[in-house]
Regions:
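Low-complexity, Ser/Thr/Pro-rich intrinsically disordered segments found in N-terminal tails, propeptides
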Residues: 50-72, 113-115, 122-123, 130-133
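Secreted, short cysteine-rich peptides and small extracellular cysteine-rich domains stabilized by multiple disulfide
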Residues: 57-100
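N-terminal leader/presequence-like segments
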Residues: 22-26, 31-35, 43, 52-54, ...
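A positional/structural detector of protein chain ends, strongest at the extreme C-terminus
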Residues: 1-4, 37-38, 339-341
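Intrinsically disordered, low-complexity N-terminal regions enriched in serine/proline/glycine
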Residues: 14, 22, 33, 49-50, ...
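Intrinsically disordered, low-complexity basic segments at termini and long loops, enriched
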Residues: 1-33
Length: 341
């Protein structure tokens, strides 16, 4: 909003000055009037130019791990592919776009598989789909969206439900009409109870009983969730901006619903060979991508087999959750058969 207001003010002033200049030229006024007009015109043009430059300036990021002392705290300019938000690889001390790394789920869901191949899975708005499923962990995503008169619905991941052990973790974006960057719009619950993370970048909330740690990567809307021995999830709440709506044709009204959603990045600690789900399957050792690699928008199908009845359901057709004992039993049977032979 700030940029738009400044441009309107600057251009309005410019229009006023040009109009005034025409009348001044007709009615005279002497050198003093001409000089004042020229000076004000210069200021108006400078103001427009300056605001355009400042608003386009990319964001900065830095390494936050003091172990990498050579890189720690060093500011880096975000790459052109993600000028508003990026992360720094502390090992090589270079910025990168988090949404371009394996394990990412961003935008109108755009996935980067464990094999490094990018694909889209659109699903359906107001429905839940299995993202990752394994014997010890199950992660569903709730999709929100908007009708598209030209074809499929536009969809985004509004929240995730993580099941591990006997626990249920909810991480979601609150519904907001007008986006304010300094409002914390991330909502987290563990087993139905709200999680109140202390304020401030670097603040940590921990549940030792659940083996769960949540850290604020930024003061608002950006956290890293770690389930010990299973998964690390980075979750960031972002809106659909007016520029994105214009470019992609989302047709989102400014004061209606900015469709706040999650940008996610998953790091799986010890995935089993039977790992499945929209994203999980791409980590399986025998997985072969079925998407059209050369397509402008490669689509992952299989909506029915990934569909779940609700956010914490494990009833999708490819569910693996809770099968740890079965897998161990099958391995034992195989071993006994081998010995008998």
């Amino acid at each position: 909003m700030g940029k738009k207001k400044v441009h309107i003010t600057s251009l309005g002033l410019l229009h006023f000055l040009v109009t005034s200049g025409r009348y001044a030229g007709r009615g005279g006024g002497g050198k003093g009037s001409d000089m004042r007009f020229t000076w004000l015109l210069f200021l108006a043009l400078s103001n427009c130019f300056f605001c355009s430059i400042v608003s386009a300036k990319p964001a900065k990021a830095h390494c936050k791990n003091p172990y990498f002392w050579r890189c720690y705290g060093v500011p880096h300019t975000c790459p052109p592919g993600c000028p508003k938000f990026c992360q720094v690889d502390c090992k090589i001390c270079k910025p990168y776009c988090a949404c371009d790394k394996p394990g990412a789920v961003c935008q109108d869901p755009r996935f980067i598989g464990g094999d490094g191949i990018m694909f889209y899975f659109h699903g359906r708005k107001d429905k839940d789909f299995c993202l990752v499923t394994d014997a010890g962990i199950h992660i569903n995503g709730h999709f929100i969206g908007k009708n598209n008169r030209k074809g499929r619905d536009f969809t985004w991941v509004q929240s995730i439900g993580v099941l591990f052990g006997r626990h249920r973790l909810f991480v979601g974006a609150r519904k907001v009409s007008r986006w304010h960057a300094f409002d914390d719009n991330i909502h987290i619950q563990l087993d139905g109870a709200d999680v109140e993370i202390p304020s401030g970048e670097g603040a940590v909330w921990e549940s030792r009983g659940a083996g769960l740690t949540i850290e604020r990567v930024a003061a608002e809307n950006d956290v890293v969730v770690e389930v010990t021995g299973l998964v690390e999830i980075r979750a960031r709440v972002v809106p659909i901006t007016a520029e994105e709506s214009r470019v992609h044709g989302y047709d989102i009204a400014e004061d209606d619903d900015c469709f706040a959603h999650l940008e996610l990045s998953f790091k799986l600690s010890s995935p089993s060979p039977s790992l499945h789900g929209i994203l999980g399957q791409t980590y399986a050792p025998d997985y072969r991508s079925r998407v059209k690699i050369g397509a402008a928008m490669p689509i992952m199908g299989g909506e029915k087999k990934f569909s779940s009845s609700h956010l914490f359901a494990t009833d999708c057709a490819v569910s693996r959750f809770g099968t740890e004992g079965e897998e161990e039993g099958n391995e034992l049977k195989t071993a006994n058969v081998a010995k008998s032979q």
